[in-house]
């Protein structure tokens, strides 16, 4: 986030339900950080919906919301691109997600042409209202339901995000986190370097959690 090219004001709502609060060193002009610590703290169950609702409670109806997941990769142009795309619809996102499992070195370009992964989705206005309604435990895959129900939606191609799978810590719910996730084998890490450039160093061979980003993993600072 420190390298994002978007120069406008940002209010970053960070939801952290780990037992130990994540250390934060991030500071940037025109950025406000809001920390939310929902309780009870994570006990091994799926707290995605609970945490989303806790974050949404801090957000007003006229705000534009960009979902950022702490283990995924966002190119520096991501926020700038997103805000440029908001002219097209109330719900916007990047299609054909790119997934990379750092445990198995398996990568895959997904075929999602009718929805974006939650990590690469943004919303405003009626789409934000809809998201509040469906971000509940009733739905396992909230992103798919959101894109099915939204009336004003737009998908674009940008290759600016990568869903990083298999990091240490709590397991993700998507198929990419499974060790049996199929795709192409990246024998020498060249695909990860192609996708992430120098930032690949934070993910390559991260099998012991030394580069993990969640407080539940190592407490690595937010940046």
Regions flagged by a language model, labelled:
Residues 1-9:
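Short, acidic, metal-binding catalytic loop of nucleotide-sugar glycosyltransferases
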Residues 8, 59-63, 88:
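Active-site acidic short loop of glycosyltransferases
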Residues 8-19, 36-40:
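Short beta-strand/loop segment that forms part of the nucleotide-sugar
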Residues 17, 68-70:
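Active-site acidic Asp-centered loop
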Residues 21-62:
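Active-site-proximal specificity loops/subdomain of glycosyltransferases
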Residues 66-68, 75-141:
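Conserved catalytic core of nucleotide-sugar-dependent glycosyltransferases
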Residues 133-223:
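C-terminal catalytic/acceptor-binding lobe
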């Amino acid at each position: 986030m420190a390298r994002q090219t978007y120069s406008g004001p940002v209010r970053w709502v960070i939801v952290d339900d780990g037992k130990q609060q994540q250390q934060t060193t991030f500071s940037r002009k025109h950025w406000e950080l809001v920390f939310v610590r929902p309780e009870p703290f994570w006990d091994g169950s799926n707290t995605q919906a609970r945490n989303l609702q806790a974050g949404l409670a801090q957000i007003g109806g006229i705000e534009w919301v960009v979902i950022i997941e702490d283990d995924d990769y966002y190119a520096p142009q991501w926020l700038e691109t997103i805000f440029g795309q908001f002219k097209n619809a109330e719900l916007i996102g990047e299609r054909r997600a790119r997934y990379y499992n750092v445990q198995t070195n398996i990568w895959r370009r997904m075929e999602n042409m009718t929805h974006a992964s939650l990590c690469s989705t943004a919303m405003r206005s009626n789409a934000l209202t809809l998201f509040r309604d469906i971000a509940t435990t009733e739905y396992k895959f909230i992103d798919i339901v959101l894109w099915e129900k939204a009336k004003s939606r737009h998908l674009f191609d940008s290759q600016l995000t990568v869903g990083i799978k298999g990091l240490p810590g709590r397991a993700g719910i998507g198929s990419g986190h499974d060790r049996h996730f199929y795709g192409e084998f990246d024998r020498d890490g060249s695909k990860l370097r192609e996708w992430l450039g120098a930032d690949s160093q934070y993910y390559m061979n991260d099998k012991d959690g030394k580069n993990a980003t969640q407080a539940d993993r190592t407490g690595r600072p937010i940046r």
